[in-house]
């Protein structure tokens, strides 16, 4: 479980001091809970996120434990280092909006015909209760030829999950190389 510290002071000086000590500034919020300003050690946080299997994961702040999902993050445009992360605390049975990653498998036929695989949409916006949240959308790209794509409407439908993106948006496709 990922452990963080609750920030007593939310001043700019305090944030700079925490960043200098190797902390990532974060905010935990959700329906029915009070916002919690906190900080996590940067490297263990990144390592934990890369190794986790599900979108929802537990964090411990002080004596409280929250089930959270990464809602938004900010990176330094020059160094590409994480600066800030917003964590949405989820409650069982309460619908929320999430962004579910798209993963692809297979090698498209179009790559042999001088095509390039283009991932147009890395995340799909959905609305559902946390217990119905899919970990990812898996797309088989093997049958795709040049100038073919998979749209949002072609994705696997999950029960009790409403896709918020327009159904005619391309998710992944093969385009012709110039």
From Swiss-Prot:
<comment type="function">
    <text>This is one of the proteins that binds to the 5S RNA in the ribosome where it forms part of the central protuberance.</text>
</comment>
<dbReference type="InterPro" id="IPR011035">
    <property type="entry name" value="Ribosomal_bL25/Gln-tRNA_synth"/>
</dbReference>
<dbReference type="InterPro" id="IPR020056">
    <property type="entry name" value="Rbsml_bL25/Gln-tRNA_synth_N"/>
</dbReference>
<comment type="subunit">
    <text>Part of the 50S ribosomal subunit; part of the 5S rRNA/L5/L18/L25 subcomplex. Contacts the 5S rRNA. Binds to the 5S rRNA independently of L5 and L18.</text>
</comment>
<dbReference type="GO" id="GO:0006412">
    <property type="term" value="P:translation"/>
</dbReference>
<dbReference type="GO" id="GO:0022625">
    <property type="term" value="C:cytosolic large ribosomal subunit"/>
</dbReference>
<dbReference type="InterPro" id="IPR001021">
    <property type="entry name" value="Ribosomal_bL25_long"/>
</dbReference>
<comment type="similarity">
    <text>Belongs to the bacterial ribosomal protein bL25 family. CTC subfamily.</text>
</comment>
<dbReference type="InterPro" id="IPR037121">
    <property type="entry name" value="Ribosomal_bL25_C"/>
</dbReference>
<dbReference type="InterPro" id="IPR020057">
    <property type="entry name" value="Ribosomal_bL25_b-dom"/>
</dbReference>
<dbReference type="InterPro" id="IPR029751">
    <property type="entry name" value="Ribosomal_L25_dom"/>
</dbReference>
<keyword id="KW-0687">Ribonucleoprotein</keyword>
<dbReference type="GO" id="GO:0003735">
    <property type="term" value="F:structural constituent of ribosome"/>
</dbReference>
<keyword id="KW-0689">Ribosomal protein</keyword>
<protein>
    <recommendedName>
        <fullName>Large ribosomal subunit protein bL25</fullName>
    </recommendedName>
</protein>
<dbReference type="Pfam" id="PF14693">
    <property type="entry name" value="Ribosomal_TL5_C"/>
</dbReference>
<keyword id="KW-0694">RNA-binding</keyword>
<dbReference type="InterPro" id="IPR020930">
    <property type="entry name" value="Ribosomal_uL5_bac-type"/>
</dbReference>
<dbReference type="GO" id="GO:0008097">
    <property type="term" value="F:5S rRNA binding"/>
</dbReference>
<keyword id="KW-0699">rRNA-binding</keyword>
<dbReference type="Pfam" id="PF01386">
    <property type="entry name" value="Ribosomal_L25p"/>
</dbReference>
């Amino acid at each position: 479980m990922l452990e963080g510290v609750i920030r007593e002071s939310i001043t700019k000086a305090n944030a700079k001091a925490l960043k200098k000590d190797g902390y990532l500034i974060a905010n935990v919020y959700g329906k029915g809970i009070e916002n919690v300003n906190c900080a996590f050690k940067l490297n263990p946080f990144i390592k934990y996120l890369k190794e986790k299997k599900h979108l929802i994961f537990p964090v411990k702040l002080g004596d409280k434990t929250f089930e959270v999902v990464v809602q938004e993050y900010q990176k330094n445009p020059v160094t590409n280092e994480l600066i800030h992360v917003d964590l949405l605390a989820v409650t069982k049975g309460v619908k929320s909006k999430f962004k579910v990653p798209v993963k692809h498998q297979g090698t498209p036929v179009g790559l042999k015909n001088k095509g390039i695989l283009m991932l147009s949409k890395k995340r799909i916006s959905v609305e559902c209760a946390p217990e119905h949240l899919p970990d990812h959308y898996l797309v088989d790209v093997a049958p795709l030829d040049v100038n073919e794509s998979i749209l949002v409407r072609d994705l696997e439908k999950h029960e009790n999950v409403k896709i918020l993106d327009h159904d005619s948006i391309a998710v992944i496709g093969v385009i012709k190389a110039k």
